[in-house]
Design a protein with these regions (language model features):
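N-terminal segments that mediate ammonia production and transfer
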Residues: 2-193
Length: 193
């Protein structure tokens, strides 16, 4: 017999001001590391961009770090999948304004798009192993394997400014240790939910 401790949740709201929510939430979730060290997720409502474009975070594979239950793949497949995503965006009338590769499998795009998000999301996620983590004008959802400090450093979250955020540190009890199973989740296919 022993104590079972699982998962930790933290959130913050700053009314009327923009602050470094990435760093604040990282510190809060790191204090909850004992509640769930397997994966950590951040839902950050940042400043958005001045043009009002969509910010899309997505992955084309899984993190196969120590402790992961994901199947190891040849990393060259990630580039192929990313090119397929780019083609779908163009074919749907979207324009990639800015693209960042954050890990071998994870990306952040700023996109001009003014059509149906459901159609867009289905097309992007039709690419094998591809999942949109978030899409919105201010919401950015980041999740990966590791504690809050590891994930924050990997994605540069300590630089994100905004008004509110919620996060989750996870102990995998009934599903695999992978990004797909990490929390929180995007309200597919709605912007900023």
């Amino acid at each position: 017999k022993g104590n079972i401790i699982m998962c930790g949740i933290a959130g913050l709201i700053h009314k009327g001001k923009t602050v470094n929510i990435g760093k604040e939430l990282q510190d809060m979730l790191q204090a909850l590391k004992h509640r769930g060290p397997d994966s950590t997720g951040f839902a950050l409502y940042g400043e958005g961009n001045s043009q009002g474009d969509y910010i899309m975070r997505f992955k084309v594979g899984e993190n196969v770090a120590e402790g992961s239950s994901a199947v190891k793949e040849d990393k060259s497949i990630y580039d192929t999948r990313r090119k397929q995503v780019d083609k779908h965006i163009r074919d749907l009338g979207g324009d990639i304004v800015k693209d960042e590769q954050l890990t071998p499998y994870s990306f952040r795009y700023v996109i001009k798009y003014d059509k149906d998000l459901m159609e867009f999301s289905k097309a992007i996620e039709s690419v094998e192993m591809t999942e949109i983590l978030s899409m919105g004008k201010t919401l950015e959802l980041v999740k990966d394997i590791g504690d809050a400090a590891v994930v924050s450093k990997q994605y540069g979250l300590d630089k994100i400014k905004g008004t509110h955020a919620i996060g989750h540190s996870r102990m995998a009890t009934e599903s695999g240790v992978d990004i797909r199973s990490a929390h929180p989740f995007w309200g597919y296919p709605f912007s900023d939910v």
